[in-house]
Regions:
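Long, charged N-terminal interaction/targeting segments
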Residues: 1-65
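Short, flexible, mixed-charge glycine/proline-rich loop motifs
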Residues: 61-69, 82-87
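Cys/His-enriched microdomains
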Residues: 71, 91, 109
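Short functional micro-motifs and their immediate structural scaffolds
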Residues: 79-82, 98-102
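Short cysteine-rich clusters marking metal-coordination/redox-active sites
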Residues: 73-76, 93-96
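Short Cys/His-rich "knuckle" micro-motifs
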Residues: 83-86, 103-107
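Charged phosphate-binding loop/patch that engages nucleotide di/tri-phosphates or the phosphate backbone
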Residues: 113
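Compositionally biased, charge-rich low-complexity tracts
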Residues: 118-123
Length: 123
């Protein structure tokens, strides 16, 4: 349920941009989400459809791009893709066997691209 306030903020950012650009509508939005955010993508999509109703983003296509978690091994300093879930869950560094990591990337959450349709002048 923590997705709803996040989606509201994302929509606000997009609407502010569209207003500044004098857009008639928002056609698509690409959202980059680091895997460490632990957002449920189905809820992000569902809530976006809900909160965008009645706005110029109501017909926008929401593109969700997942970004991997990149960590540095605290022992050997190698960079690895860290997996949080499933059979590939990372517990040890594949290079040295180290068990402690520093996260470098994977916590991101940002609007990467907004495609708008501009208003025609004078109409």
């Amino acid at each position: 349920m923590h997705e709803l306030p996040i989606v509201k903020q994302i929509l606000n950012v997009c609407l502010q941009y569209a207003e500044k650009e004098e857009a008639e509508s928002i056609k698509s939005i690409r959202l980059c989400i680091g895997e460490a955010n632990d957002l449920i993508l189905e809820y992000v999509d569902k809530y976006f459809k809900y909160v965008s109703r009645g706005t110029i983003a109501s017909e926008a296509k929401l593109e969700l791009e997942m970004l991997p978690i990149i960590c540095e091994c605290n022992t050997c300093k190698e960079h690895i893709i860290y997996h949080l879930k499933g059979d590939e869950r990372t517990t040890n560094c594949p290079f040295c066997g180290g068990e402690e990591f520093t996260m470098l990337n994977g916590g991101e959450l940002f609007v990467d691209k907004i495609e708008i349709e501009k208003k025609e002048n004078g109409i």
